[in-house]
From Swiss-Prot:
GO terms for biological process: L-histidine catabolic process to glutamate and formamide; L-histidine catabolic process to glutamate and formate. Belongs to the metallo-dependent hydrolases superfamily. HutI family. Pathway: Amino-acid degradation; L-histidine degradation into L-glutamate; N-formimidoyl-L-glutamate from L-histidine: step 3/3. Its EC number is 3.5.2.7. This is Imidazolonepropionase. One of its GO terms (molecular function) is imidazolonepropionase activity. It comes from Stenotrophomonas maltophilia (strain R551-3). It catalyses: 4-imidazolone-5-propanoate + H2O = N-formimidoyl-L-glutamate. One of its GO terms (cellular component) is cytoplasm. The lineage of its organism: Bacteria, Pseudomonadati, Pseudomonadota, Gammaproteobacteria, Lysobacterales.
């Protein structure tokens, strides 16, 4: 069988099945951007590759997937970081006109070119750590033209940087200054969601359901509008208090419920029944100096899938390192190495509704890969402040190091 590229002499972290699915001394082949063979050394005898690459004993995993980011924005909120160091809470900052709305002002004022220029370095930092797929939310415009601008810039950045960008509409992120909450919710549902769906600018709709943002009733209204327009559902839930948002989202078959530090047993049961992924965001937990841990043990016991993400945003998680987020997941949330790696691959893909396309090394999946100079998979989680990425591959096309050649 002819194949485009065959990698040999690599240790595979397949994530196919339980655990990491490691195949030592493996081979992987792709054709037309998809994986067509995965197996141990010697299983490739009938393959005729155009390009053969010796992995030289490195490790290969699916390309990393960051399933929760707010990467496209303008401005800087270092001043709020200083305020929090002085003991002022995130909620107090938000109520005083800071927080999300301060980024809204800067993002509205930025041209698309300025927005792309400020956001590109953040995307490149993630790409440099093996990210091949990245979710980017809107939510810093809070008007239809400005939300549209964010989503368009996100899509363009992905195309220009060879990263698969999945866009999520988060118009229900904050109440704009001078607006009444219900009036604005009606606009999100009756004006913004129909337009965003018609223009094909987003795959999902998200809501920040919290006592400083949108009520459960308003979140329900947004979910109903999303469902009516064929968009998937996600939620920022139970970050600061238990609003029962995760349970609500699960009743709509949500892809994921994110943050969930204050999640209760009813929410866990609802997520388990619906197959809703728990997206854990240790960067925000760390940066806001939170002390309430997500109910990890109960989520495990219920069989809720656990994904990890950076939550990259200017206010509560200015983090662009998936590798550091993995370490935080282990040290702060007591996740295992397997859970951390799966959380940025297989389970992150599920949180984006793409579990049948990315996140595993298996026949038929997109050939999105990360190749690492490590001794064992645990090195991806254990070490801090280093980047062992050797190469990325997106749909079968490598970012070729100089040492690779066609042989």
């Amino acid at each position: 069988m002819h194949v485009d590229t065959l990698w040999s002499n690599v240790h595979l972290i397949t994530l196919d099945g339980e655990g990491l699915g490691v195949i030592r001394d493996g081979v992987l082949a792709c054709a037309d951007g998809r994986i067509v063979h995965v197996g141990p050394a010697g299983s490739d005898a009938n393959l005729r590759p155009t390009t053969r690459i010796d992995g030289e004993g490195r490790w290969m995993s699916p390309g990393l997937i960051d399933c929760h980011t707010h990467l496209v924005y303008a401005g800087n909120r270092a001043n709020e970081f200083e305020q929090r160091l002085q003991g002022i809470s995130y909620a107090e900052i938000a109520r005083a006109g800071g927080g999300i709305v301060s980024t809204v002002r800067a993002t509205r004022a930025a041209t698309p070119e300025q927005l792309a220029s400020e956001s590109r370095p953040r995307l490149l930092a993630m790409r440099a750590e093996g990210v091949t797929t990245l979710e980017i939310k809107s939510g810093y415009g809070l008007t239809l033209p400005d939300e549209r601008k964010q989503l368009q810039v996100a899509r363009a950045l992905g195309e220009g940087c060879r990263v698969n960008v999945v866009t999520t509409f988060l118009g229900a992120h904050a109440i704009p200054p001078g607006r009444e909450a219900q009036e604005y919710t009606d606009e999100v549902c009756n004006v913004m969601i129909p337009a965003i769906a018609a223009e094909g600018l987003a795959e999902a709709v998200d809501v920040f359901c919290e006592n400083i943002a949108f009520s459960p009733a308003q979140a329900r209204q947004v979910f109903e509008a999303a469902r009516a327009h064929g968009l998937a559902i996600k939620i920022h839930a139970e970050q600061l208090s238990n609003q029962h948002g995760a349970e609500l989202a699960a009743s709509f078959g949500a892809l994921s419920a994110d943050h969930i530090e204050h999640l209760d047993d009813a929410g866990i049961a609802a997520m388990a029944a619906a197959g809703t992924v728990a997206v854990l965001l240790p960067g925000a937990f760390y940066f806001t100096r939170d002390t309430t841990l997500p109910p990890i043990a109960a989520l495990r016991a219920a069989g809720v899938p656990l994904a990890l993400a950076t939550d990259s945003n200017p206010g509560t998680s200015p983090l662009t390192s998936p590798l550091l987020a993995m370490n935080m997941g282990a040290t702060l949330f007591r996740l295992t190495v397997d859970e951390c790696i799966a959380g940025f691959t297989r389970e992150a893909a599920r949180a984006l509704g793409r579990g049948d396309r990315i996140g595993r090394l298996a026949i038929g999946m997109d050939c999105d890969l990360a190749i690492w100079d490590i001794d064992a998979p645990a090195d991806l989680v254990y070490r801090i402040g280093f980047n062992p990425l050797h190469a990325r591959v997106v749909r079968g096309q490598p970012d070729l190091p100089a040492s690779w050649s066609n042989t």
